């Protein structure tokens, strides 16, 4: 993986974001996702690489494109593994709400954890708290550590938690410390990454979300030097989701074992979820969010706002791109 490829993956997420954004607010979440998938797959196909999807839209028999194990790219060049979410926050996009984006993580072959389609308990925090907060500690303990590391009063800390019934006790404990809570309905990748930047108003992400998105968040936080830990959740009583209505704890453990995951309670650090020598993250806003704006359609151009983070040169680049239409007559400065 090289710097040229990092530029290419920026364009991949830009095209996916533009495709989804055309359906923003129309209540068509499946169509928005499909549009992003098709655009992402098409742009990936032009890149000189031997790409492979390790986290995607599902198993081969569940998804027509960007399925797990699918080969993407020209078929020549470096071997690259991808974890993709072409439209993270499909409900957000469908309802024109904040926080939807096209995202992916890339690494050298074998450098991304093949996360099962399970849930994951996550903890994300700023670089100053890396290795000091710990998912094994209670939320109260971690909030006190955050306050000390950041030099911020607990009452001024904001903790992001997904708005789910399973987080009732977590929310109650956080509130008991005096810290603030920002509930989100979907899209915890952007919230996790926001913890890595000062000035976002987001200081920590706690709670359970999707495991595949945890790998994407881990890749970004590793490149930023931030803190990220994840632990797979296999007990339906903890996940509290209708998606597991017919699943049992024992059945889920069996599924994990069949996938080669025998240490089912392992706590994964960012550099284990994204272990490659070279790791990159790319995200482009579909709707406005914590880190960047969504797609803006104008008469003669389309504007995208994106972020690329890479370990190759230890950079985080915020990029505003003007995609000029054929026959454009006038393009405003901003």
From Swiss-Prot:
Its cofactor is Mn(2+). Keywords: Calvin cycle, Carbohydrate metabolism, Hydrolase, Manganese, Metal-binding. Mn(2+) 1 binds at residues 33, 57. It holds the Pfam family FBPase_glpX. One of its GO terms (cellular component) is cytosol. Gene3D superfamilies: 3.40.190.90, Fructose-1,6-Bisphosphatase, subunit A, domain 1. InterPro entries: FBPase_class-2/SBPase. Homotetramer. This is D-fructose 1,6-bisphosphatase class 2/sedoheptulose 1,7-bisphosphatase. It comes from Prochlorococcus marinus (strain NATL2A).
């Amino acid at each position: 993986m090289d710097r040229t490829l990092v530029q290419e993956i920026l364009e991949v997420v830009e095209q996916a974001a533009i495709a989804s954004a055309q359906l923003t607010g129309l209540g068509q979440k499946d169509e928005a996702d499909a549009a992003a998938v098709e655009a992402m797959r098409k742009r990936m196909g032009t890149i000189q690489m031997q790409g492979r999807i390790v986290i995607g839209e599902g198993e081969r028999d569940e998804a027509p494109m960007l399925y797990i194990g699918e080969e993407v790219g020209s078929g020549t060049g470096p071997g690259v593994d991808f974890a993709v979410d072409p439209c993270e926050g499909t409900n957000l996009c469908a309802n024109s709400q904040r926080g939807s984006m096209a995202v992916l993580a890339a690494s050298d072959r074998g450098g991304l954890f093949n996360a099962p389609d399970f849930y994951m308990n996550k903890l994300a925090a700023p670089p100053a708290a890396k290795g000091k907060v710990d998912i094994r500690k209670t939320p109260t303990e971690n909030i006190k550590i955050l306050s000390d590391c950041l030099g911020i009063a607990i009452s001024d800390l904001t903790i992001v938690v997904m708005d789910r019934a399973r987080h009732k006790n977590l929310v109650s404990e956080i509130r008991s410390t005096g810290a603030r809570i920002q509930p989100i309905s979907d899209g915890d990748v952007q919230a996790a990454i926001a913890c890595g930047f000062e000035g976002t108003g987001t200081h920590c992400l706690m709670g359970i979300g999707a495991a595949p998105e945890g790998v994407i968040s881990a890749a970004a936080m590793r490149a930023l030097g931030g803190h990220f830990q994840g632990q797979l959740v296999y007990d339906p009583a903890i996940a509290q989701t209708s998606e597991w209505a017919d699943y049992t704890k024992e059945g889920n453990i069996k599924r994990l074992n069949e996938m080669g995951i025998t240490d089912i309670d392992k706590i994964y650090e960012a550099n284990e979820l994204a272990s490659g020598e070279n790791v990159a993250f790319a995200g482009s806003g579909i709707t406005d969010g914590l880190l960047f704006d969504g797609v803006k359609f104008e008469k003669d151009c389309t504007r995208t706002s994106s972020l690329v983070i890479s370990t190759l040169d230890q950079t985080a680049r915020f990029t505003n791109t003007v995609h000029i239409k054929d026959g454009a007559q006038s393009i405003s400065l901003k």
